[in-house]
């Protein structure tokens, strides 16, 4: 087995570095758009193993990425908890906001078992993937998932969730712990179904002050890691606290994750320091892929120059956008694999 991404997570330097993209199965691909039409709703796509397998494999067939990431959504966890969830064109995910009293009635026992179609997708993808391709599972971090549950939709600064946490600290702590426990079970099931490693997406960690970051981001993720490792002691786990800034320092040590996913705002000088303590992943601005040309080439070259001589998985600093031209994605891959540093 020669899965380069796993070698990097374990701390090895592989050059040229392995590459995959967050949201690599997505709307920038015509084949994805066709499959999405067949599915009907977005949730039907997530919960239909045959279709979810197809979209997971599409970017592997087209680009030969070094990792495939399970096609699903971070909000299937609250959906399994019994919260309503729908996706509307142009509006993203919509939920009925949860209130403090409802949180105390949430039951976590057996919730992860309701996501069996996701695990079937993992099993089927692993059967069909090339042996050298790493299969990544994932979940949303409790803070990020909670922001959607409380506001009922995405917001620019997550003010509803922040205010809720200040006003109802006991309910909010229970919500984070419940989400951590269900998410841990969810990741354990994914690993059991054949995922090689898992990533925890904390897309909204950058809106918190230092104290709240510690309580709402660090502790719940550490709880997930601890519970996963109680079942799979060697589990490889990637943490992605997007927007954490200076608080990236110490995140790996405090949470127990193996590899740090970096957003594009992290200076490469700081990224290189973080790399001294272990593997990093990132961190090209997704809009450089949209722009192409020199903007793309210079961004790729800078990352390879500063971090190519250490354990690096090349990725974007967040998900690829639907506007990204396919030829620019190929240009990025060719440049990374060309190995300039």
UniProtKB/Swiss-Prot annotation:
It catalyses: uroporphyrinogen III + 4 H(+) = coproporphyrinogen III + 4 CO2. Transmembrane segments: none annotated. InterPro entries: UROD/MetE-like_sf, Uroporphyrinogen_deCO2ase_HemE, Uroporphyrinogen_deCOase. Keywords: Cytoplasm, Decarboxylase, Lyase, Porphyrin biosynthesis. Belongs to the uroporphyrinogen decarboxylase family. Homodimer. HAMAP family: URO_D. This is Uroporphyrinogen decarboxylase. The gene is hemE.
């Amino acid at each position: 087995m020669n899965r380069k991404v796993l070698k990097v997570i374990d701390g090895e330097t592989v050059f040229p570095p392995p590459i995959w993209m967050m949201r690599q199965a997505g709307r920038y691909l015509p084949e994805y758009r066709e499959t999405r039409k067949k599915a009907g709703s977005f949730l039907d796509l997530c919960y239909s193993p045959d279709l979810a397998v197809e979209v997971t494999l599409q970017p592997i067939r087209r680009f030969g990425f070094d990792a495939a990431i399970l096609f699903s959504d971070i909000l299937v966890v609250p959906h399994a908890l019994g919260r309503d969830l729908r996706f509307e064109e142009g509006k993203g995910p919509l939920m009925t906001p949860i209130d403090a009293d409802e949180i105390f009635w949430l039951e976590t026992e057996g919730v992860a078992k309701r996501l069996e179609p996701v695990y079937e997708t993992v099993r089927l993808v692993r059967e069909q993937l090339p042996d050298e391709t790493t299969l990544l599972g994932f979940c949303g971090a409790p803070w990020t998932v909670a922001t959607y549950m409380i506001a009922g939709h995405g917001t620019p600064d997550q003010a509803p969730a922040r205010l809720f946490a200040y006003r109802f600290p006991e309910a909010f702590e229970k919500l984070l712990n419940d989400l951590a426990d269900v998410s841990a079970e969810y990741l354990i099931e994914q690993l059991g179904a054949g995922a090689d490693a898992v990533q925890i997406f904390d897309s909204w960690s950058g809106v918190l002050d230092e104290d709240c970051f510690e309580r709402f981001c660090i502790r719940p993720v550490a709880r997930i890691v601890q519970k996963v490792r109680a079942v799979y002691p060697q589990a490889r786990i990637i943490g992605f606290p997007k927007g954490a800034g200076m608080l990236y320092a110490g995140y790996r040590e405090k949470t127990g994750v193996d590899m740090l996913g970096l957003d594009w705002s992290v200076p490469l000088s700081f990224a290189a320091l973080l790399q001294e303590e272990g593997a990093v992943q990132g961190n090209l601005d997704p809009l450089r892929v949209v722009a192409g040309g020199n903007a793309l080439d210079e961004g790729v070259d800078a990352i390879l120059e500063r971090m190519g001589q250490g354990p690096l998985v090349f990725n974007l600093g967040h998900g690829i956008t639907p506007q990204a031209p396919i030829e620019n994605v190929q240009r990025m891959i060719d440049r990374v694999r060309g190995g300039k540093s």
